[in-house]
Amino acid sequence: MSRFDEASNWLVQRLPMFQRQGGTPATYRMDLDKTRQWLQVLGNPHQAYPCIHVAGTNGKGSTCHMLASIYQEAGLVVGLHTSPHMLDLRERFRVGGRLMPEAWVADFVEAHRRDIEDLELSFFEATVGMAFAAFRDARVDLAIVEVGMGGRLDSTNVVMPLASVITSIGLDHTAFLGPDRSSIAREKAGIIKPTVPVVVGEWDAEILPVFQEIALANNSQLHCVSSQNRVFLTDLQGDYQAQNARVAIQTVAVAGIPVLEHQIRRGLSKVAANTGLRGRWDVLEKRPLVVADSAHNSHGWIPAMLQWNRIRGSKRAAMVLGVVSDKDLTELLQTIPKDCVIFGCEPSIPRALELTAWVALLRDAGLQVRACLSAAEAINQAKAEGFQAIYVGGSSFVVADALAAYRDGLVSKRNHS
């Protein structure tokens, strides 16, 4: 095992991780004290460069990648912090669209393993510090920093950004962020800083007063993005990406770093190539069509299903779906197309909803179901049965499993249709 693999495995297996275990006192802390202590140990690397801070129920990851791509096209060295990762924890802290060297990660963990243990950091706290340190060591000109969950208490909420961005507000993580959209908006608006401009991508009557109140209290100018805002074409598939692009364009306009229009256009047209984004309406195969998407809550799932129904048309269609155990699945189950055959699977994380329970829920919803042990098995079986369009999702962890299966050659490339 390489030094990098040892370091990566230690971080993933040893440290409390929300994505794997769900919310516990060890994975979701109700203050930023540990994060601040950790950053002090590291020499406060987050203070070494300007940044843009992005929160939101959905769209924040794509918007971060768009911003990184735009600023890269403008000639800046850009650090990009996002989560969760799909295949490699270094996806959480890219520089110029590239992963940090494996040796850097191994050296960092060896140097700070005792600090991480002594502070009893969660995986997210540890990797946020890693990201900020990586960006300092790489001498970035700008960092794009995605919030992990919420905003007010998120470990990233130690930065003083050029702009604060809130892409959207939906019902997700309600046990931590509040029972309604107004409460969730208040938590996410916790990233608003004094005099720092704020860009919001969703602002209906339920949540706009929250943004107005907190922006006013911070003397921050509020910029509300609508479908009337200008938009340029992006290479990212997914109908929802147009609004993310509008948010990115508005953010560039208020952040204060000069960027030319042709650089914005080029950045939006090369997001995946410039930043390595995967898992957002990601076409894994064309014949048959296999598309993976990370939509995992009703706010993201409903538009994803509208697009799925449109692109599959009259094709014989299947869906490879798996979920985590701590989500409200009511809306998801109600909106799965009844004419699709469902290949139920279990994401390879401890938080996964166990397969027999998931299959039972699908059958109770009146769906045609096949039970499969893994995403790879499900995709292979759907292809073997001749389905012409296959959707992979329900959870970002199912998407990650599918990407890993394709990478490792576990999906048959033979076209059975």
Language-model features and meaning:
Residues 1-58, 62-77, 87, 197-199:
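N-terminal leader/targeting and accessory segments in enzymes
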Residues 22-32, 36-48, 73-159:
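ATP-dependent carboxylate-amine ligase catalytic core
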Residues 81, 197-202, 318-321, 341-349:
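Short internal beta-strands
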Residues 84, 130-176, 205-235:
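Extended acidic/charged loop-beta regions that coordinate divalent cations
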Residues 137, 142-145, 154-165, 169-171, ...:
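Nucleotide phosphate-binding/pyrophosphate-handling subdomain across enzymes
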Residues 162, 176-191, 195-254, 260:
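Internal gly/pro-rich beta-alpha loop/helix module
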Residues 204-223, 289-291, 331-389:
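C-terminal helical cap/extension that packs against the catalytic core
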Residues 377-407:
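A glycine-rich beta-strand to alpha-helix segment
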